[in-house]
Protein backbone atom coordinates (compact mmCIF):
# COMPACT_ATOMS: atom_id res chain seq x y z
CA UNK A 1 0.00 0.00 0.00
CA UNK A 2 1.47 3.32 -1.08
CA UNK A 3 0.61 6.61 0.58
CA UNK A 4 -0.18 9.87 -1.16
CA UNK A 5 -0.34 13.13 0.79
CA UNK A 6 -2.58 15.72 -0.87
CA UNK A 7 -2.48 19.27 0.43
CA UNK A 8 -4.94 22.09 -0.28
CA UNK A 9 -5.12 25.66 0.96
CA UNK A 10 -7.79 27.36 3.02
CA UNK A 11 -9.62 30.25 1.29
CA UNK A 12 -7.78 33.57 0.99
CA UNK A 13 -8.04 36.97 -0.64
CA UNK A 14 -11.71 37.41 0.22
CA UNK A 15 -12.85 34.10 -1.32
CA UNK A 16 -15.24 31.87 0.63
CA UNK A 17 -13.88 28.66 -0.89
CA UNK A 18 -10.61 27.42 -2.32
CA UNK A 19 -10.80 24.84 -5.12
CA UNK A 20 -7.62 23.15 -3.93
CA UNK A 21 -9.16 22.35 -0.55
CA UNK A 22 -12.46 21.26 -2.11
CA UNK A 23 -10.52 18.93 -4.39
CA UNK A 24 -8.51 17.45 -1.52
CA UNK A 25 -11.70 16.85 0.47
CA UNK A 26 -13.21 15.00 -2.49
CA UNK A 27 -10.11 12.90 -3.06
CA UNK A 28 -9.62 11.98 0.60
CA UNK A 29 -12.95 10.14 0.54
CA UNK A 30 -12.15 8.19 -2.63
CA UNK A 31 -10.36 4.88 -3.02
CA UNK A 32 -7.69 3.85 -5.49
CA UNK A 33 -6.31 0.30 -5.64
CA UNK A 34 -3.32 -0.10 -3.32
CA UNK A 35 -3.22 3.64 -2.56
CA UNK A 36 -3.96 5.39 0.73
CA UNK A 37 -4.93 9.03 0.19
CA UNK A 38 -4.27 11.45 3.04
CA UNK A 39 -5.70 14.98 2.93
CA UNK A 40 -4.13 18.00 4.61
CA UNK A 41 -5.57 21.52 4.93
CA UNK A 42 -2.87 24.18 4.74
CA UNK A 43 -3.09 27.71 6.19
CA UNK A 44 -2.35 30.56 3.79
CA UNK A 45 0.24 31.84 6.23
CA UNK A 46 3.97 32.31 5.72
CA UNK A 47 6.06 29.52 7.32
CA UNK A 48 2.99 27.94 8.97
CA UNK A 49 2.15 26.49 5.56
CA UNK A 50 5.53 24.75 5.32
CA UNK A 51 5.42 23.55 8.93
CA UNK A 52 1.92 22.10 8.47
CA UNK A 53 2.90 20.02 5.46
CA UNK A 54 6.22 18.86 6.90
CA UNK A 55 4.44 17.73 10.07
CA UNK A 56 2.01 15.72 7.93
CA UNK A 57 4.96 14.19 6.06
CA UNK A 58 6.59 13.08 9.31
CA UNK A 59 3.31 11.72 10.67
CA UNK A 60 2.25 9.76 7.59
CA UNK A 61 5.55 9.03 5.79
CA UNK A 62 4.02 9.27 2.30
CA UNK A 63 5.56 8.03 -0.93
CA UNK A 64 4.22 11.03 -2.83
CA UNK A 65 3.34 14.62 -1.88
CA UNK A 66 1.07 16.59 -4.20
CA UNK A 67 0.60 20.20 -3.13
CA UNK A 68 -2.35 21.91 -4.82
CA UNK A 69 -3.22 25.58 -5.09
CA UNK A 70 -5.67 27.97 -6.74
CA UNK A 71 -4.57 29.91 -9.81
CA UNK A 72 -7.07 32.61 -10.78
CA UNK A 73 -6.99 33.30 -14.50
CA UNK A 74 -5.58 29.95 -15.57
CA UNK A 75 -7.73 27.76 -17.77
CA UNK A 76 -5.76 24.51 -17.38
CA UNK A 77 -4.33 22.27 -14.68
CA UNK A 78 -0.69 23.36 -14.45
CA UNK A 79 2.02 21.23 -12.86
CA UNK A 80 4.69 23.62 -11.63
CA UNK A 81 8.23 22.89 -12.76
CA UNK A 82 10.27 25.09 -10.41
CA UNK A 83 10.04 26.85 -7.05
CA UNK A 84 12.11 30.00 -6.41
CA UNK A 85 13.57 31.25 -3.15
CA UNK A 86 11.57 34.47 -3.04
CA UNK A 87 8.67 35.86 -1.03
CA UNK A 88 7.18 38.97 -2.67
CA UNK A 89 3.52 39.07 -1.67
CA UNK A 90 1.20 41.27 -3.73
CA UNK A 91 -1.44 40.88 -0.99
CA UNK A 92 -1.27 39.98 2.69
CA UNK A 93 -1.48 36.34 3.69
CA UNK A 94 -4.20 35.26 6.11
CA UNK A 95 -2.13 36.37 9.11
CA UNK A 96 -1.36 39.81 7.70
CA UNK A 97 2.18 39.08 6.52
CA UNK A 98 3.33 40.79 3.35
CA UNK A 99 7.06 40.24 2.81
CA UNK A 100 8.69 42.03 -0.11
CA UNK A 101 11.82 40.71 -1.84
CA UNK A 102 12.72 38.35 1.00
CA UNK A 103 14.18 34.84 0.75
CA UNK A 104 12.07 31.95 1.96
CA UNK A 105 15.14 30.21 3.38
CA UNK A 106 18.15 32.51 3.77
CA UNK A 107 20.71 29.75 3.28
CA UNK A 108 18.80 27.96 0.52
CA UNK A 109 19.61 27.83 -3.19
CA UNK A 110 17.91 30.07 -5.72
CA UNK A 111 15.47 27.36 -6.82
CA UNK A 112 14.35 23.74 -6.61
CA UNK A 113 12.78 21.68 -9.36
CA UNK A 114 9.70 19.53 -8.88
CA UNK A 115 10.49 15.84 -8.53
CA UNK A 116 7.18 14.91 -10.17
CA UNK A 117 7.13 13.62 -13.76
CA UNK A 118 5.57 16.87 -14.99
CA UNK A 119 5.80 16.01 -18.68
CA UNK A 120 4.26 12.57 -18.23
CA UNK A 121 1.48 14.14 -16.15
CA UNK A 122 0.78 16.76 -18.80
CA UNK A 123 0.75 14.20 -21.61
CA UNK A 124 -1.58 11.83 -19.72
CA UNK A 125 -4.14 14.54 -18.98
CA UNK A 126 -4.01 16.00 -22.47
CA UNK A 127 -4.59 12.54 -23.94
CA UNK A 128 -7.67 12.26 -21.72
CA UNK A 129 -8.99 15.59 -23.00
CA UNK A 130 -8.27 17.50 -19.78
CA UNK A 131 -6.58 20.90 -20.31
CA UNK A 132 -3.10 20.67 -18.80
CA UNK A 133 0.21 22.41 -19.42
CA UNK A 134 3.51 22.81 -17.61
CA UNK A 135 4.00 26.09 -15.74
CA UNK A 136 7.41 27.62 -15.12
CA UNK A 137 6.28 30.07 -12.44
CA UNK A 138 4.38 29.30 -9.26
CA UNK A 139 4.25 33.00 -8.41
CA UNK A 140 5.78 34.62 -5.33
CA UNK A 141 2.92 34.14 -2.84
CA UNK A 142 2.23 31.28 -0.43
CA UNK A 143 1.92 28.63 -3.17
CA UNK A 144 5.53 29.13 -4.26
CA UNK A 145 6.53 29.62 -0.61
CA UNK A 146 5.15 26.20 0.32
CA UNK A 147 6.51 24.54 -2.82
CA UNK A 148 10.04 25.84 -2.18
CA UNK A 149 10.00 25.07 1.54
CA UNK A 150 8.84 21.48 1.07
CA UNK A 151 11.31 20.83 -1.76
CA UNK A 152 14.11 22.22 0.43
CA UNK A 153 13.35 19.71 3.17
CA UNK A 154 12.60 16.72 0.93
CA UNK A 155 15.19 17.04 -1.86
CA UNK A 156 17.52 14.50 -0.19
CA UNK A 157 14.73 12.05 0.65
CA UNK A 158 13.07 9.39 -1.49
CA UNK A 159 9.71 11.17 -1.48
CA UNK A 160 8.43 12.56 -4.74
CA UNK A 161 6.92 16.00 -4.32
CA UNK A 162 5.69 18.92 -6.33
CA UNK A 163 3.04 21.58 -6.79
CA UNK A 164 -0.03 21.67 -9.03
CA UNK A 165 -2.03 24.82 -9.75
CA UNK A 166 -5.70 24.43 -10.69
CA UNK A 167 -8.29 26.85 -12.13
CA UNK A 168 -11.14 28.39 -10.19
CA UNK A 169 -14.39 26.50 -9.76
CA UNK A 170 -17.33 27.73 -11.89
CA UNK A 171 -19.10 29.20 -8.86
CA UNK A 172 -16.03 31.36 -8.14
CA UNK A 173 -15.38 32.43 -11.70
CA UNK A 174 -18.88 33.40 -12.85
CA UNK A 175 -18.93 36.81 -11.19
CA UNK A 176 -15.57 37.89 -12.60
CA UNK A 177 -15.80 36.15 -15.99
CA UNK A 178 -12.61 34.15 -15.40
CA UNK A 179 -11.70 30.67 -16.67
CA UNK A 180 -12.87 27.76 -14.54
CA UNK A 181 -12.95 23.97 -14.35
CA UNK A 182 -15.56 21.71 -12.80
CA UNK A 183 -14.76 19.82 -9.62
CA UNK A 184 -15.63 16.58 -11.44
CA UNK A 185 -12.96 17.25 -14.07
CA UNK A 186 -10.44 18.24 -11.40
CA UNK A 187 -11.08 14.99 -9.50
CA UNK A 188 -10.58 12.94 -12.66
CA UNK A 189 -7.41 14.87 -13.46
CA UNK A 190 -5.95 14.44 -9.99
CA UNK A 191 -6.63 10.70 -10.04
CA UNK A 192 -4.71 10.48 -13.31
CA UNK A 193 -1.88 12.57 -11.87
CA UNK A 194 -1.51 10.31 -8.85
CA UNK A 195 -1.48 7.16 -10.96
CA UNK A 196 1.04 8.69 -13.38
CA UNK A 197 3.34 9.77 -10.56
CA UNK A 198 3.22 6.36 -8.89
CA UNK A 199 3.75 4.42 -12.12
CA UNK A 200 6.34 6.63 -13.86
CA UNK A 201 9.89 6.18 -12.60
CA UNK A 202 11.50 8.56 -15.09
CA UNK A 203 9.79 11.48 -16.77
CA UNK A 204 9.19 11.38 -20.50
CA UNK A 205 11.47 13.46 -22.72
CA UNK A 206 9.62 15.78 -25.06
CA UNK A 207 9.38 19.52 -25.31
CA UNK A 208 7.39 21.27 -22.62
CA UNK A 209 9.10 24.63 -22.68
CA UNK A 210 7.89 28.06 -23.69
CA UNK A 211 9.29 30.91 -25.80
CA UNK A 212 8.65 33.52 -23.10
UniProtKB/Swiss-Prot annotation:
Which BP terms does GO give this entry?
Answer: proteolysis
Give a GO cellular-component term.
cytosol
EC number(s) of the enzyme?
Answer: 3.4.19.3
Matching InterPro entries:
Peptidase_C15 (IPR000816), Peptidase_C15-like (IPR016125), Peptidase_C15-like_sf (IPR036440), PGP-I_bact-type (IPR029762), PGPEP1_Cys_AS (IPR033694)
Alphabetical keyword list: Cytoplasm, Hydrolase, Protease, Thiol protease
Provide the catalytic activity annotation: Release of an N-terminal pyroglutamyl group from a polypeptide, the second amino acid generally not being Pro
Q: Which GO terms describe its molecular function?
A: pyroglutamyl-peptidase activity
The active-site annotation reads: 80, 143, 165
Kindly report, in one word, the top-level EC class recorded for this enzyme.
Answer: hydrolase
**Keyword Nucleus set for record:** no
Q: Where in the cell is it found?
A: Cytoplasm
Q: What is its main location?
A: cytoplasm
Q: How does it assemble?
A: Homotetramer.
Q: What does this protein do?
A: Removes 5-oxoproline from various penultimate amino acid residues except L-proline.
Family the entry assigns: Belongs to the peptidase C15 family.
Q: Known NCBIfam families for this protein? A: PRK13197.1, pyro_pdase
PANTHER family, alphabetized = PROTEASE FAMILY C15 PYROGLUTAMYL-PEPTIDASE I-RELATED, PYROGLUTAMYL-PEPTIDASE I
- Please report the name of this protein according to its UniProt entry: Pyrrolidone-carboxylate peptidase
Q: Please give the organism.
A: Vibrio vulnificus (strain YJ016)
Tell me the organism's taxonomic lineage.
Bacteria, Pseudomonadati, Pseudomonadota, Gammaproteobacteria, Vibrionales
Amino acid sequence: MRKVLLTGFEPFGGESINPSLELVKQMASRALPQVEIIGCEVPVVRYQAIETVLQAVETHQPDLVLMIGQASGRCAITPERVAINLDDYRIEDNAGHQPVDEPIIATGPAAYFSTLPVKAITHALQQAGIPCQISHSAGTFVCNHLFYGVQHHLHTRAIRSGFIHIPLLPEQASASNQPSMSLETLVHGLEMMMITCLETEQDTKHTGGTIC
